[in-house]
């Protein structure tokens, strides 16, 4: 009887350990980075199908501050989605996690519209991260 109880408890524990990952535990991948210019500017990061399917995006800013106005995500099926950020990012800061609509999506490219009035003469670097 004890052996049956042990195997039942072990099976229940094993079943609970195979649950899906939470949003914070899903793997993130660096999709690209751009050094920003001074004043109002536009950049894009190309992402290929080889990078995989994504459920979310996040921006990280390094070296210098950046005022990010918006990003436009172009998907593999031709659709595009615009996300207004309107946020001043300090060096070392990051955006909120931007959840992509629908299920996992193929991303072709991401366009950025930003400006910077960097008085410290350090150009900021914007990194684009994708969540699988």
Which residues are covered by each model-predicted region?
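Charged, low-complexity intrinsically disordered segments
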Residues: 35-39, 90, 117, 129-132
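Exposed aromatic-hydrophobic patches
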Residues: 43-48, 94-102
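Transition segment at domain starts
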Residues: 20-48
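Short, surface-exposed beta-strand/strand-loop-strand elements in extracellular ectodomains
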Residues: 63-85, 121-131
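Solvent-exposed serine/threonine-rich low-complexity stretches and specific carbohydrate-binding patches
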Residues: 32-34, 82-90
């Amino acid at each position: 009887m004890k052996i049956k109880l042990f195997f039942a408890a072990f099976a229940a524990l094993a079943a609970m350990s195979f649950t899906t990952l939470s949003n914070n535990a899903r793997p993130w991948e660096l999709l690209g980075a751009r050094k920003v210019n001074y004043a109002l500017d536009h950049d894009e990061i190309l992402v290929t199908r080889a990078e995989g399917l994504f459920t979310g995006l996040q921006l990280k800013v390094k070296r210098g501050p950046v005022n990010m106005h918006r990003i436009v995500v172009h998907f593999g099926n031709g659709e595009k989605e615009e996300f207004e950020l309107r946020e001043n990012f300090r060096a070392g800061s990051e955006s909120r996690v931007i959840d992509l609509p629908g299920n996992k999506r193929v991303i072709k490219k991401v366009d950025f519209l930003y400006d910077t009035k960097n008085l410290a003469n350090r150009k900021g670097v914007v990194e684009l991260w994708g969540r699988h």
